[in-house]
Structures are given as structure tokens and as C-alpha cells.
Amino acid sequence: YHMDHLGQLTAALPEIPLYMGMLSKEVAMISAEYQDKNLYLRLLGANTFRGGEAFTIGDIRIRPLVIDHSAADSYMFVIEAEGKRVLYTGDFRRHGLRHHVLDKLVNTYIGEVDVLITEGTSLSRDAGDYISEATVLDDISSYIQDGKYVFVMCSSTNIDRIMGIWQNMPIDKVLICDAYQKRILDTVINNVYYESSLY
């Protein structure tokens, strides 16, 4: 549901079918309801899937696998057709709160593939250049503990970060968000179906 994946969707021919994770569709529709009526209408007809449950389009078998990313309900896809196996990684991270999922996916569900298609946003970054999500949350928790008022600015769809802040909130502090943010959080909490210690 990040706009780098949805931003041009309304320019696609309407007869082209759209497939999304169930939770991604719900969150994207909330965002589109506030920002883009045409995108909202396009999302209404989207087909949905769940992680681990393969589906077919014609002779192509697609198995979505839930992966760690700042957007909850992000997927890698194992695509099988004409005797070949392709892994499309989508966006993923190894520094998030569910980073351990990647090795399990590769060893248990993916195995060997004929073709790897991956995004290259961080390929040139040195391994030591990133800060883990756990470190970010620890730093935020320290500021919250020490400060009277702390304002956290992040994407309203960075669910892991927001839920991590909420779970680490000192007992004498309160997390306040607007109605839009609460609606997104409630949607995630009520619709997530995979393992997460956050929601």
C-alpha cells in the first residue's frame, strides 16, 4: 500500500486484474478514501490473497510469502510457470523487527529458483550503514521517557514503528494519534493473520 507501488494504478487499463494482500487492500483503501477517489474505486475490485496460500492466473502459479518491511502485509512471490521458478522479492528489509523471517522463508518455502528479481534501493549501501528498527525504537523510547511532550513523525502506514512505540510506552505516558491513524491501526490489529509480536 505504499504509493511507490500504487501511485500509477489508476493509469493502468481497468480490465487488467489487480491482486493485493487482504490487509494491504484494507489499508490502501483507507488511504485512498482520504486522498484519491479514483484510486479508491480501482481498489474496490482488487482480488485478494493471503500469505502462504498459492493462487493461479492462467497457467502461472503464484505463492505469496509475508516478509518484513515497513508496510505490514508485504510479500515476496514464488512464481512458477513452464517448469521454471522465479522469486520476486518485492520490498523487504533485514533490519526490521521481523528480520528473522527471511532465512526461514528461503530455507523452508523458497529453496532454489531459476530467476531472482529484486528491488535495488539499498544494494549499494554498506551493511554497517543502516540502523536497525529495534535501535530506532529504543531511541524513541528514551526520548519519550525523558521528555514531557514527544512528537513522532513517521508515515501513518509504518505500522511496525507505531505499534513498537505504543508497546514500549511508559505507563505514565499516553500515545495520541488522529482518527485517520487510529483507523489504520485498528484495521491492522483486527485483520492481521500472521505472526507478529506487535499486533
Task: Give the label of every model feature segment.
Residues 4-160, 164:
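His/Asp/Glu-rich metal-coordinating catalytic cores
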Residues 35, 171-172, 191:
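Residues at alpha-helix termini
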Residues 46-50, 175, 181:
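Beta-strand->loop->alpha-helix junctions that form or flank phosphate-binding loops
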Residues 137-140, 169-176:
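Short, electropositive alpha-helical surface patch
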Residues 149-154, 173-179:
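Short hydrophobic beta-strand segments
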Residues 164-168, 179-180:
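Composition- and surface-driven signal marking solvent-exposed, interaction-prone regions
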Residues 180-199:
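A contiguous, basic/glycine-rich beta-loop/short-helix subdomain that forms a polymer-engagement track
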